[in-house]
Each structure stands twice: as C-alpha cells, then as structure tokens.
Amino acid sequence: MFRSRKSLRYATSAAALTLLLSVVPSAQTNGSAERYVATAVNMGQPGPTGPWTVEMVVNRWATDGQRDTLMQVLLSKGPNDLLKALQEMPRAGYIRTPDTIGYDLKYARKMPLEDGGEQVFLATDRYIGFWEAVNRPRTFDYPFTYVELRVGPDGKGEGKMSIFTKIGVDKKKNQIVLENYGTVPVLLQNVRKETKS
C-alpha cells in the first residue's frame, strides 16, 4: 500500500509539473532583470510564522526550448529526472529573505493577463536538510519550490508560494496554478515589481 501511495504522489506531481511547463508562453526575453518584492505570511506551514520580506529576482526567462526539454524529461523519465534536469539548468535568478543568502531560481516563465498585467511562474529545487534526507518525512516527496505571482499593470499584485504542497491545473485557462489557490500555506501580499538595469 505504501508503494501504491508513493506511486500516486509521483504521478500527481508529474502531471502537475507537466502542466506547469506547458503554460502558453509569452515572449520570454532576457533583457533587464525583473525584481519582485513581497510580504510573505505563513498560513500554517512549518517554518517562520511571518510576516517576512521575500525578494525574487529574474535575470533570465526560460525559452520555449528549455520548457520543451523539461517537459520531455518529465514525460519520458518522471519527476526524479525532472528534478535532476532542473538542477542542471543555468541560474534564472534568485529568491531570498533578508536573513538568507538566497537560493537559485532554475525556471522562470511569465504570461500576460487580460487586464494588461502578468502571471509569473518560478520554480526551483527545494533545499533538503540532513534531518529530512535521513528521516524522509512526507515533505521529502515534494522536492520543488513553486511561486506564482499575479501582477497588475501598475506593478502591484499578490501571489502564493508552495514549498510542501501540490500544484494543480486551471483547465479554463490551460495553465498551471497552485492547488487550492485560496488556501496555500504561504501567502505573498503587497507584491511590487521593479525592473533593474
């Protein structure tokens, strides 16, 4: 039964990540860096209770080719090989809080919204500490960190960050979203977008 449950988790993760990578792309350019700053509020996930500041900087947006390569790896080899492929990707930017040196973002993609704003998708491999690697709690089966931001034309918005939870699909928009967008553990408030030169 444990093996069956684990297989189900892998299949669910694989399906969700396939949809993340197949988002209808906007122009993915590598111009000026884009910086997003938000106030994070922990909604029940292990870790700091917040609020705290999160900075996300994107220096490189994923190309269609990179997206296609990751999709092919996921479809043909599964989530473990997708994790390896993601880890081998060049740095797309970083995510950090004021008290950390930050973590590299490996995948960054954005698409336009109907109101003139944008939806930003960020993904990276999640740091797994010694205790977690040895004891393999349920969180060990979710090695990805995923961020979704919705930013208006005025550069302000909101978002969610998923560290130990799953992602899902918005079939109407044919895009990946955080599963249960309204109840994900880390809420990103007061998102502000800045362009760095």
Model-derived features: where do they sit?
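Bacterial N-terminal signal peptides
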Residues: 11-22
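N-terminal secretory signal peptides that target proteins for export/translocation
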Residues: 1-7
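Long, low-hydrophobicity ectodomains and other hydrophilic envelope-associated domains
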Residues: 29-197
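Short amphipathic alpha-helical "recognition" segments used for binding
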Residues: 7-13, 85
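Sec/Tat signal peptide C-region and signal peptidase I cleavage site
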Residues: 23-28
